[in-house]
């Protein structure tokens, strides 16, 4: 990603700066500063913090700015997934994390970008789905890993 954004790790070019909840948050705040209309405008003008949950709620209420920010993140994520599909040819890609609660608002741009940027012979068999675990996937995975180590399964 060549967006010039500095990641929280201190480097530039990280996928997280363009394809994450924090990226959607940054895009929305930038557009609100430019004066774009949104359901979030009043909250922004009052100086209240806008959270990712606020953005996702606004998207579910058909807020154009929130939807565009999520679509931008989805497109960037789809481009990255396309590269991984070209290399690994997975049968299934599961989208998790808090942004996954955007459902079709993020899934459609991901699928479009994957179709555009991956080899059609390879991506034909790959399914892309939203995790049923949502934002809890990482926590559940960490618990399962700890459990497996504790029980000596790993």
Task: For each feature predicted by the language model, list its residue ranges.
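ATP-binding/phosphotransfer module of carbohydrate and carboxylate kinases, centering on a glycine-rich
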Residues: 3-6, 11-154
């Amino acid at each position: 990603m060549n967006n010039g954004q500095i990641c929280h790790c201190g480097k530039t070019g990280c996928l997280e700066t363009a394809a994450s909840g924090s990226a959607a948050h940054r895009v929305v705040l930038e557009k609100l500063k430019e004066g774009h209309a949104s359901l979030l405008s009043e909250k922004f003008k009052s100086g209240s913090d806008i959270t990712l949950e606020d953005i996702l709620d606004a998207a579910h209420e058909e807020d154009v700015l929130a939807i565009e920010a999520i679509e931008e993140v989805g497109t960037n994520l789809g481009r990255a997934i396309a590269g991984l599909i070209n290399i690994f040819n997975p049968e299934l890609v599961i989208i998790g994390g808090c942004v996954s609660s955007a459902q079709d608002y993020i899934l459609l741009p991901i699928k479009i970008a994957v179709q555009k940027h991956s080899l059609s012979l390879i991506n034909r068999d790959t399914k892309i789905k939203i995790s049923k675990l949502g934002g809890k996937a990482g926590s559940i995975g960490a618990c399962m890993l700890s459990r497996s180590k504790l029980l000596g399964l790993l």
